[in-house]
Amino acid sequence: MIYNFSVENKIRLDEFLRENLPNCVKNQEISNSKIRRLIIAGSVFVNNSQIRRPAYIVFPKSKISVNFDENKFFYEKQPDDIKYEVTQKDVLFEDEYLIVINKPSLFPTEETIVGGQKRDNLHQAVIRWIWKNNPSLRNPPYVGIMHRLDRETSGAILFTKQRCVNNDIHKMFEEHSVKKIYHAIAVTNQKNQIKDSFFIENYMGRISPKSSAAKWGFVPEKNGGLYSKTEFKILNKSNYKNMDLFYIEAQLKTGRTHQIRVHLSSAGLPLLGDELYGGIPEKRIMLHSKCLEFVHPITKEQLKINAPIPDFFNKYYNL
């Protein structure tokens, strides 16, 4: 089904679709993450040009078309998410403006609708946590989503508690001034020497059909690919049940969907548990957001926030 729109006011593309697309779909809600996925997947065209940037600005008289299959869009199989509530030990940093949580694996960052039902998510869990600790509030507290972690990725993730810091934090992420360090366990059967440090840079986009599981890969810039770069460092090597394992530190220089997963797979080092990109099956994808480092937008303090390595990683390494 193709839906066509005409723009009346200057606005971000994702915000325009959030306001207008639900009116075309009867009895269905469309979450922010669904809107973002539609755009990144290449389903949205502005003036006949494919646009993959949710923050893209559209202007009056622009023509927008959206092409998607409603049945596949709304009625996906419900994943087996864990049940989770934030506890004090999960709070890595908190003040009146910001909160950083140690996200568990197998729990989505934000709301999605699967099989016609809303899934619980970390964003709502943080709202519940703040409200629980501020029972005098008459309405749910504000919590802003600044970035996202994949459902199976654990570790440090930042939310805002006041709208006044949103622009500064958004700008930090857009300008890549937030230092993001991940730890990962990758597996390989390559006989070639793996360098102790290396980087990968290329252009990325969705390579799977819209009717199948979302998969990203290398896409030329002229075809809508977005620049991506990751720096890698090998921290340790071992052998586990005849598998060559590498304990890796990854520093994101950009923040594309599945970026670390795609880059390591392209280097012959798919993440353990990441079957989508060639990894060996495991209970979870072995990727953890280890550290966020940034300047506090109000106090100007340099913050370095570390998330403890999950116990499950110790199955392979004594970390």
Kindly give the residue locations of the regions a language model identified.
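RNA pseudouridine synthases
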Residues: M1-L319
